[in-house]
Design a protein with these regions (language model features):
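Active-site rim/loop-helix segments in enzyme catalytic domains that contact anionic ligands
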Residues: 1-125, 254, 266-269, 274-276, ...
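Metal-dependent de-N-acetylase/amidase catalytic core
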Residues: 1-12, 97-287
Length: 287
């Protein structure tokens, strides 16, 4: 791999496994091109349920935090992240749970404190491009996912302002901020393909009826040659992903590749041009 001089891509995610389900193949592609790739994982995933029956043992439950960090290391090695930074918060769980009320949870952290931690990473790593979550998350409104959006938006602006968080390093203004999106149309295509192949779809008709909003996107990244990365990285999260799950692995790889040849993103903020663009490169306008 020949490093691209100075190009850096930073992804902000809520929990271990989010980096695998969202944009993993894109990160793998840019890493292979020589772009420096940085993951910021905001929590340790301590409140997550064990979703793979084979991993649901007393030993794993007793040490779930350490297990999930080890899974994260395995997944990031598969994807090709050059560095992983843990932001240091505890998984907030869902509203109304004990985990959500803990003072060390991400959801309870003062916004400025969490933003400063992210700003510190941005100023140190100097990424031109940041990937994060959209503001619209009705399909899975986890408090930590919502908070990832909040801190990313503020940190994108604050990192370049020398008057904000002056102790967090020399100011650096990233150029572009993207949302990782998964339009409802893609869910509909996957659901239809299950039915076409005579297979039971993991998506209920009730759930499909709720998928009414199609996230707009500006940027389509060709993941040819890297389309298997997402599945391999997901399987590294053995507590969270059942390798027999029809949701993740029900369709044959060649069929999924046909439906999902591109990772999709929406340009939300840009210092190098308008955001209403059509692109096939996250670094468009930067090289």
């Amino acid at each position: 791999v020949v490093p691209h001089d100075g190009l850096c891509l930073l992804s902000v995610h809520a929990h271990p496994d989010d980096e695998s389900s969202k944009g993993a193949s894109t990160v793998a592609r840019y890493h292979a091109e020589g772009v420096r790739t940085i993951l910021v994982c905001c929590t340790g995933g301590e409140a997550g349920d064990i979703l793979n029956p084979a991993m649901d043992t007393p030993e794993v439950r007793a040490d779930i935090g350490a297990v999930r960090v080890a899974e994260l290391k395995a997944a990031t090695d598969i994807i090709g992240y050059d560095e992983t930074v843990m932001l240091g918060y505890r998984d907030s769980g869902m509203p109304g749970t004990e985990a959500n009320e803990r003072p060390d949870s991400f959801a309870q952290a003062p916004l400025d404190e969490a933003v400063e931690r992210l700003v510190r990473v941005i100023r140190r790593e100097r990424p031109q491009v940041i990937l994060t979550y959209p503001d619209e998350q009705t399909e899975y409104p986890h408090p930590d996912h919502l908070r990832v959006h909040e801190i990313s938006i503020v940190a994108f602006d604050a990192a370049g302002d020398a008057d904000r968080f002056p102790d967090a390093g020399p100011a650096f203004a990233p150029s572009k901020l993207y949302y990782s999106v998964w339009p409802a149309e893609r869910f509909r295509q996957i659901h239809a393909k299950f039915l076409e192949l005579g297979m039971e779809s993991p998506f209920s008709e009730e759930r499909m009826s709720r998928l009414t909003r199609d996230d707009p996107f500006t940027t389509s990244i060709d993941i040819s040659g890297f389309d298997d990365v997402r599945g391999r990285a997901l399987k590294a999260h053995a507590t969270q992903v059942d390798p027999n799950s029809p949701f993740w692995f029900g369709l044959p790889p060649e069929v999924l590749k046909e439906i999902h040849p591109l990772d999709l993103f929406r340009l939300a903020k840009s210092r190098v041009g308008p955001v209403d663009v059509t692109e096939d490169d996250l670094f468009a306008g930067l090289r």
